[in-house]
Amino acid sequence: MPRLRSLTLDEFDPELRAMLNADQKSEREMRPTSVRAHHPELAKAYVRFTAAFKQHAVLSTRLRELVRLRIAFHNQCRSCMAMRYADAVDAGVTEDLVCSLEKPHEAPDLTDAERVALRYADLMCTNHLAIGDALYAELATHFSDKEVVELGSWCAICIGFGRLAATWNMVEDLPERFQAGADTTVTPWGPDAWVTQAPVKTH
């Protein structure tokens, strides 16, 4: 069961509620924010930060979603794994492509750039001090310095906030397999993911 209570919309800070267009969303879409809403100023800062990150992104939406889902698997963040963003689906992140994340180094439908980015993400999750000159040199063959900074920052966001979300155990609205106990390893690849638009208003 969840470890922190989700606020109802009536309990939300009005500005946060408007920023998230919360009245137009389902309880499932609002679940992580309904916990963050206990601290409205931090929640609003998080919304603005992630919105700015997407607005100024130089990496493709497809790559960011692949990295997010691969990290969600390492984190075992059930709410992260069960969700797909609509803009990523529109950018070509199909469930067949998500299945490639099981063994990304072998997947024929991933590009060389995506494979090295996912290897970097894997190490960020599991052994960040093993990331050395050789991997950064390989990243440089596919990405600009600006893109590498964005990739690392995206990994940091997904790892940190994903692990936090995993400890909150917000699984009550998720498909059944994502509600399995912590001793069961769950994967993001499968037929039961759901799509969220997640629009925000930052002005």
Where are these regions (language model features)?
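Hydrophobic alpha-helical segments
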Residues: 1-203
